Amino acid sequence: MRNVKIAAIQMQCSTNLQANLEKAEKMVRQAAGDGAQIILLPELFEREYFCQQRRYDFYHLAKPVEENDAVQMGMRLAKELNVVLPVSFYEQDVNTLYNSIACIDADGTLLGVYRKTHIPDDHYYQEKFYFTPGNTGFKVFDTHFGKIGIGICWDQWFPEAARCMALMGAEILLYPTAIGSEPILECDSMPHWRRCMQGHAAANLMPVIAANRIGREEVTPSPENGGQSSALVFYGSSFMTDETGELKACASRDQE
């Protein structure tokens, strides 16, 4: 058994791509300065959660992995800081679009890409409009600091995903996430969300780390979105468990 120090970054995202990248870089540097060896950023942190609305012009936000700004930033920082850095991004592969993770090793090498398997299609979590279900299968990455399995947000609700990665040799499970208020049901899903992943840790005897965003994100009516007006409040609560599922660290609902 070896000790690995992991950081989960919880941040608020804006409509300004460059500002989000600069904030992410600042927080990655801070985590590395505190000794973190694996640093997890939230899902799709480059922008506000654009899947709240359906806009055909947002398809152009997707880029091939080698052209994505966040991935390029991640490769640079991973090499400079000697950290493992999974980076969530909107991927274009020829004519198909995916919700993906690029796993970057501590020497800046791109180890590979995992494409999100489970795609939600609920009010204001309208991901099937933007993403095709992934074709990579679940993946485990053999990094400098250990073998990590990575699921993306809605993947976290399915025990089969965690079990598959455990059987593939994962030692740690990571879940970058963008989750918040329920637009139809008047309920707080956070405790259920967290307990579900605690169960994955307990059942598979490995630590689980989840990184979520925070803040209220609003959609204003426009011709491009068919006049939609809506809002989601992302509830943060990023956390880490040990291998028995016991909570070891948990962030607040509204602080970075």
How would you name each of these model-derived features?
Residues 123-139, 156-158:
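Active-site glycine-rich loop that binds ribose-phosphate moieties when present
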Residues 1-6, 140-149, 172:
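Beta-strand-turn-beta hairpins that frame and shape the catalytic cleft
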Residues 6, 103-111, 239-249:
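Short, glycine-anchored, charge-dense loop/turn motifs used at functional sites
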Residues 66-86, 153-256:
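CN hydrolase (nitrilase-like) catalytic-core segments centered on the catalytic cysteine
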Residues 17, 26-113, 179-199, 203-206:
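Cys-nucleophile CN-hydrolase/nitrilase-fold catalytic domain and related Cys-dependent amidase chemistry
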Residues 116-130, 255-256:
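A short, polar/charged loop-to-alpha-helix boundary motif
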Residues 1-38, 174:
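N-terminal active-site segment of His-dependent metallophosphoesterases
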Residues 53-61, 122-123, 223-228:
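Short glycine/proline- and charge-enriched loop/turn segments
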